């Protein structure tokens, strides 16, 4: 077996964290031959819950789990890590405006960005799951910039990507394995653009483009997009809790593919720092289609847009620029 990977999960006492840690520990994310040292971080008030999660992981008797430790301070959490799942964030409460939510999260992700710079390896790879994920990733990357390159920071839009795959499979009466290359553009929010223009569906051994497979353009430009955009809210309405199982699976898919690479001819959606591709402002954490090889993602180039797609992408870009500006103002206001 190879040397253990040290993997941090923040917010590990919460629902999503609880669902993520088992997938990391049992080899789903990094493979059955790769031992992991799991570090679970949460606030001191959750130390008892964290200890219970540690006990459960020990009781799973997993060959790939080299060690597991629960911590409540950033130095212990971030020291020497290879991967970070930043799940913990301030949730939006009733009556809270976006700027208030951003201000609360700026403090958390500024602190974690600085901790990454001070204690983590320069090769550490980071996925931000806690919302607003794109902007939280932007802030963490900003404060870790002296040590960890921006390309090592990402935010999760794989949940939206997986939701889009599932809806397309349901509509065409096939299975997930027969659908590929959906794209989530932009923010992990209600403005995201789930795009199937370049997606394909394999039915009865024949691969066809998604629009032809569905045969209903109005559906793909209306209800399909709305279903993916609003899915999280619908699940809260039904369960009275936010998506946890599906969010954890998506975070693990995201890191699995970053670690092992994407399959030939397939791309996935990741929110990563823009390099100016498709006219998206440089540095904005924006969901793009990417391919991954050797642990490095690349934005898929040369895709074309119609006016409908351009309008959707412009709307999500505008929202992300506003979020970024509000977050930077919160940094200034808090003198951080």
From Swiss-Prot:
PANTHER family in the cross-refs: MALATE DEHYDROGENASE
Positions that bind NAD(+): 11-17, 42, 105, 112, 129-131
Reactions it catalyzes: (S)-malate + NAD(+) = oxaloacetate + NADH + H(+)
GO terms assigned for molecular function: L-malate dehydrogenase (NAD+) activity
Highest taxon in the source lineage: Eukaryota
InterPro entries the UniProt entry points to: L-lactate/malate_DH (IPR001557), Lactate/malate_DH_C (IPR022383), Lactate/malate_DH_N (IPR001236), Lactate_DH/Glyco_Ohase_4_C (IPR015955), Malate_DH_AS (IPR001252), Malate_DH_NAD-dep_euk (IPR011274), Malate_DH_type2 (IPR010945), NAD(P)-bd_dom_sf (IPR036291)
Enzyme Commission (EC) number: 1.1.1.37
GO cellular component labels: cytosol
Descriptive protein name: Malate dehydrogenase, cytoplasmic
Keywords: Cytoplasm, NAD, Oxidoreductase
Primary role: Catalyzes the reversible conversion of (S)-malate to oxaloacetate in the cytoplasm where oxaloacetate is used for gluconeogenesis.
Source organism of the structure: Caenorhabditis elegans
Subunit structure and binding partners: Homodimer.
Gene Ontology biological process terms from the UniProt entry: malate metabolic process; NADH metabolic process; oxaloacetate metabolic process; tricarboxylic acid cycle
Residue numbers binding substrate: 92, 98, 131, 163
Family: Belongs to the LDH/MDH superfamily. MDH type 2 family.
Temperature-related activity annotation: Optimum temperature is 40 degrees Celsius.
Localization in the cell: Cytoplasm
Residues of the active site: 188
Amino-acid biosynthesis among keywords: no
């Amino acid at each position: 077996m190879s040397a253990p990977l040290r993997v941090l999960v923040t917010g590990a006492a919460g629902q999503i964290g609880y669902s993520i840690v088992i997938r990391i520990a049992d080899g789903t994310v990094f493979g059955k031959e790769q031992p992991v040292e799991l570090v679970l971080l949460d606030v001191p008030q959750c130390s008892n819950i964290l200890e219970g999660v540690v006990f459960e992981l020990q009781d799973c008797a997993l060959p790939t789990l080299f060690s597991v430790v629960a911590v409540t301070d950033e130095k212990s959490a971030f020291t020497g890590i290879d991967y970070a799942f930043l799940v913990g964030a301030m949730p939006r409460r009733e009556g809270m405006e976006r700027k208030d939510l951003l201000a609360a999260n700026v403090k958390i992700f500024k602190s974690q960005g600085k901790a990454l710079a001070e204690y983590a390896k320069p090769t550490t790879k980071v996925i931000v799951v806690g919302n607003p994920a794109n902007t939280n990733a932007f802030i963490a990357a900003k404060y870790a910039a002296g040590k960890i390159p921006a390309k090592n920071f990402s935010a999760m839009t794989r949940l939206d990507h997986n939701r889009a795959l599932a809806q397309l499979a349901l509509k065409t009466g096939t299975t997930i394995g027969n659908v590929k290359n959906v794209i989530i553009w932009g923010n992990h929010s209600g403005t995201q653009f789930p795009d199937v223009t370049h997606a394909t569906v394999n039915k009865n051994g024949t691969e066809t483009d998604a629009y032809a497979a569905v045969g209903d353009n109005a559906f793909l430009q209306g209800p399909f997009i709305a279903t993916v955009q609003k899915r999280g809210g619908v699940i809260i309405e039904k369960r009275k809790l936010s998506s946890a199982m599906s969010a954890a699976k998506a975070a693990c898919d995201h890191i699995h593919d970053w670690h092992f690479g994407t399959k030939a001819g397939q791309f996935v959606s990741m929110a990563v720092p823009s390099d100016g591709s498709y006219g998206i402002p440089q540095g904005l954490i924006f969901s793009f289609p990417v391919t991954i090889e050797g642990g490095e993602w690349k934005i898929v180039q040369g895709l074309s847009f119609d006016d409908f797609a351009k309008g959707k992408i412009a709307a999500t870009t505008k929202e992300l620029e506003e979020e970024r500006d509000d977050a930077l103002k919160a940094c200034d206001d808090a003198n951080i």
